[in-house]
Regions:
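Short Cys/His-rich metal-coordination motifs, predominantly Zn2+-binding knuckles/fingers
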Residues: 117-119
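C-terminal recognition-helix end and immediately following basic linker
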Residues: 111-112, 125-145
Length: 145
């Protein structure tokens, strides 16, 4: 998958320091027979995996620009992450995403400032970081605050 052999992909995706994206969200939607609505905090865009499959439940994720966080709703019957596919839950998840966007709780990978933990070189965005990694062999980066 994605340019890897099956064994390479399994090793990659089961590494606790790695995570998946669209492909894995599609797989999980099908496997668990639930819609997965991923809301991009920066843009407000919602990508819904499993849409049109007639699933009766939905899970909401917030995409920070770096990773996904599950949305858990606190109901009188307890905390729940899996909800009916109704407009009320969608509206609440969108409201949360809008609040986080207003607070700047997302990372813009194109404009974030990074530094190389090996040599200290400062870069703007993930493209410059990949270019630096290719030229120097350095692969340890951190966000500059």
């Amino acid at each position: 998958m994605l340019g890897k052999t099956q064994s390479q992909y399994i090793a990659y995706i089961t590494d606790s320091l790695k995570w998946g994206g669209q492909v894995e969200l599609n797989i999980m939607s099908s496997l668990f027979q639930v819609e997965i609505a991923a809301i991009d905090i920066q843009s407000g865009r919602i990508d819904t995996y499993g849409q049109g499959e007639q699933y009766s439940q939905r899970v909401y994720l917030l995409f920070t620009g770096i990773h996904f966080d599950a949305v858990v709703f606190d109901h009188s019957s307890g905390k729940r992450a899996v909800l009916p596919t109704d407009a009320k839950a969608k509206e609440a998840a969108q409201k949360l995403a809008t609040s986080l966007q207003t607070q700047g709780k997302f990372t813009d990978q194109a404009t974030m400032t990074l530094y190389c933990k090996v040599c200290g070189h400062v870069m703007k965005g993930d493209l410059e970081a990949r270019t630096h990694a290719g030229a120097s062999g350095h692969t340890e980066f951190a966000m500059k605050k």
